[in-house]
Amino acid sequence: FEMGDIEFNGKMYYGLMLNLNCYRGEVHVRVGTTKDCIVLKNSLVGDFNIGKRRYVSLNGEREIKGLDAGYYQVLYDGKDMILKQIRVELYDRAEFPSGNITKVFVPKVKYWLVKEGQVRQIRKERDLQRVYKPFKRDIKSYMSHHSEKDMDSNLVYLMSMVEGAH
């Protein structure tokens, strides 16, 4: 749980302890200083912040065509928007020779570009070259000097470059 703010049922609440359960797609609010928590109804949750991370709720009327309903982290919000979708899947893993089966949570991350109402999946930073053709050389130059392991900050930098902030 981290400190955050949330819009719930059209009203803002500040300074709450929040947690996003990516496996179940739920937002949890801790009750005071106890270990108890409340699971919020998805259809009533609006945008929220957990720590310094901002999230949008794309449930019900707020859905964007081409994206699954759920919560998305906003990495970049300018003329165009980059959203990060985090899902967690549960797998059984058998250990040999003991024969024990353990449950393993595996995070699955997808990045989405929302440009002029159209949604496109971004698998690598280089996918932006196809969308922003005038900046193809700049994107290629940037990526030749930066690791593709830090996708979040690379996408933020590239989008701010494309939209004229750098």
Q: Where on the chain are the PLM-derived regions?
A:
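Aromatic-patch recognition
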Residues: 2-122, 126
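Long, compositionally biased interface segments
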Residues: 130-166
